[in-house]
Amino acid sequence: MASEDIAKLAETLAKTQVAGGQLSFKGKGLKLNTAEDAKDVIKEIEEFDGLEALRLEGNTVGVEAARVIAKALEKKSELKRCHWSDMFTGRLRSEIPPALISLGEGLITAGAQLVELDLSDNAFGPDGVRGFEALLKSPACFTLQELKLNNCGMGIGGGKILAAALTECHRKSSAQGKPLALKVFVAGRNRLENDGATALAEAFGIIGTLEEVHMPQNGINHPGVTALAQAFAINPLLRVINLNDNTFTEKGGVAMAETLKTLRQVEVINFGDCLVRSKGAVAIADAVRGGLPKLKELNLSFCEIKRDAALVVAEAVADKAELEKLDLNGNALGEEGCEQLQEVMDSFNMAKVLASLSDDEGEDEDEEEEGEEDDEEEEDEEDEEDDDEEEEEQEEEEEPPQRGSGEEPATPSRKILDPNSGEPAPVLSSPTPTDLSTFLSFPSPEKLLRLGPKVSVLIVQQTDTSDPEKVVSAFLKVASVFRDDASVKTAVLDAIDALMKKAFSCSSFNSNTFLTRLLIHMGLLKSEDKIKAIPSLHGPLMVLNHVVRQDYFPKALAPLLLAFVTKPNGALETCSFARHNLLQTLYNI
């Protein structure tokens, strides 16, 4: 390290925050590769008496630097809180496990008794979980109360490793007469899916002391949701349940509602964007009406709930004196339904509690019926472990005996919700196929899958591939529904491949303009147009990681894309796993 760099580092360290037993290097942007780089950090640690909390967020720590920092921690037995989120930026994934192993060994040697461990926003994947597995099983974590692993890309494998480690920690600590009493568990955006969630649910059921569970955006469907619901029922102290942006369907909604009936301490329920639909919402409303005396927030936004079910939910919160927010935005109430909902809440003197309804999707008489069919399809898929077998079985189950080759499947009699009883009532309905314009107006994975294999042809036919702005619009709408679910992922990438292959092969298509406009809409490049950036970059980044590896992608665009994805940006920081994967791919082009 050059002398001027050392001087700069020393100046940065001089501003290090020291308060209440806490030593903070948070957000210093330190690049600690070697032992020499970490020399001043180590000095600060060694000279700090009574160190209880160490903040390393917002720096980047290499293997060698981690080893010497760990050595310094071996004498810090009073350390209780490790705030180590976002501290491997720019590191190869292979560097992270050995760095974590070293740090964990330092804590174990010190005889520390941790209360909080935060490793969020480190894109370490399943192998990274192996890096702190031994720490979790050790006496250093027998006292752990808060475990935060948000946005780490653990996947199913990492979820299973984590669950086993927590179970072992509980077993060992129980043998010493002081069972692990974990209170807060955070693991959003980790692609846990059903198997990972189910494994963790088993661990939660054994632990039994949870007060907060945050697991949004994990691709969990109703089998995983049901497993979690069963585990939550054995955790009577639960106050916060955040499963935002997973796919409950009605089956998961009903299962979770049954658990809510048994809990008395719950204050916050966040099931937004979970597709509980009307039947699930009515079941949850029943649980709210009969209990949950401390409820402060109920989020059922963007769940495909219709008017009558939404009114049932509103009526259920009438006696919740502590309620601060009811969010039913983004459902299918219609203008009249929104007015009725506001009137109901106003009649309870709770108008201020109701969140905005500005994104209501409008009343659609056929949408509920389509949703019922989606539930059946999703359940058929989830019953099989192999993705390819899932798709084949689903096709077979949907195929009626009279179906001929090349014909559309006949629409059977379906059920819609009886608004009075909340029970399904049989009706006959005519087919309501989804067309591309419907999908592009309100994109969702279900609508994309309903288009079937023809989506690739349709998107090419109905998009002006000579116009970069129109291609960007179609690209972002398809990418927005990207999920790790095999069928959704395949449908998204097939549609994107067809669109981009046609666009890049068009002689009048300006590739540079396309990338520029894409970066603007993603909020990575400023524009005089004052275009509002899309809300989430996860889908577009995951899709771009696929696109840049295809033969049709002009490799001359890679350096420009790399430059903007590398630049610091708040929107990118919330998608560190997807960003890391794309950067790795771009570096290798």
From Swiss-Prot:
Compositionally biased residues, Acidic residues: 358-399
Region span, Disordered: 357-436
Covalent crosslink: Glycyl lysine isopeptide (Lys-Gly) (interchain with G-Cter in SUMO1): K8, K526
Phosphoprotein among keywords: yes
GO cellular component, one term: cytosol
Effect of substituting A563L: No effect on UBE2I binding nor on sumoylation
Location in chain, cross-link Glycyl lysine isopeptide (Lys-Gly) (interchain with G-Cter in SUMO): K8, K526
Subcellular location as annotated: Cytoplasm; Nucleus, Nucleoplasm; Nucleus envelope; Chromosome, Centromere, Kinetochore
Span list, region Important for accumulation in the nucleus: 541-566
Family stated for the protein in its record: Belongs to the RNA1 family.
Name assigned to this protein: Ran GTPase-activating protein 1
Species assigned in the record: Mus musculus (Mouse)
Gene for this chain: Rangap1
